[in-house]
Amino acid sequence: MLEIIKRLEYYAKVQPQSIALQIDDEIVNYESLYQKICDCTLNSPKFKLGSRVALLNDSPIVNITNYFVVLMMDGVPCFLDNKWSRDTIDKLIEHFHIEYVTTAVGKFKRTTSFGTYEKYISEELKVDDLLHIGFTSGTTGLPKAYYRNEPSWIGSYAENEKLIHNYETALAAPGPLAHSL
C-alpha cells in the first residue's frame, strides 16, 4: 500500500473530524473522505496495475477523491484540465495511453486507449514509485506531462510541516491543483 494511502487511513482513524480538504467553502474531514474513497473502491472497475486514469472534473474535491480511489486501485491518476478543448484532451489520452476517464466520484469510463497497456508498460517501469502524472497548461502547444513519484511527495511533507509549525494562519498554493500536489 502506498504511504500516502496509509497516512490518509491513519488520520481518518486518529483525527476523523479534522479537516482533510478545504476548497473555498467546501470542507471534507478525514473520516468522510476516507469512507467515500473506500466505498468507491468497492464499487468501481478493477484496473490493471499502472492503468492511467484521467481526472477530469471542475471540482478539486471530486478530483482529489478520485485521485485516492485510483491510487487504491493500483492505477495512475492523470490530472487533465476540463477547460482544454476536446481535441487536446483526446490527443493526450491517445499519446499517454490513458485508459479511463472519470468526471464524477467513482465513475470510470473506458477510453479509446483502453487495452494499449502493454505498449507503454516499459515507459512506466522507468519511473520509480510513480504516484501521478500532471500536465503543464499547454499555452505553448500540447500540454507536456510531468511525473511525480511517491518519495518526492513524501519529502514535501517535511517542508509543509515547517510551514504549519510556524503557525501560519493562511497558506496559498498558486496555480493548478495538479501542480500543488
Predicted regions and their residues:
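Conserved AMP-binding A3 loop
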Residues: N29-Y30, L131-A158
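Flexible, low-complexity linker/hinge segments
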Residues: K107-L130, Y147, G155-Y157, K162-N166
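Short acidic active-site motifs
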Residues: D87-T88
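Conserved AMP-binding loop of ANL adenylate-forming enzymes
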Residues: L55, L163-L181
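Proline-aspartate-enriched helix->loop->beta-strand connector
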Residues: H97-T102
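Conserved AMP-binding/adenylate-forming
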Residues: E26, L42-K83, A173-P176
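Conserved AMP-binding/adenylate-forming core of the ANL superfamily
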Residues: E9, Q17-F47, R148-P151
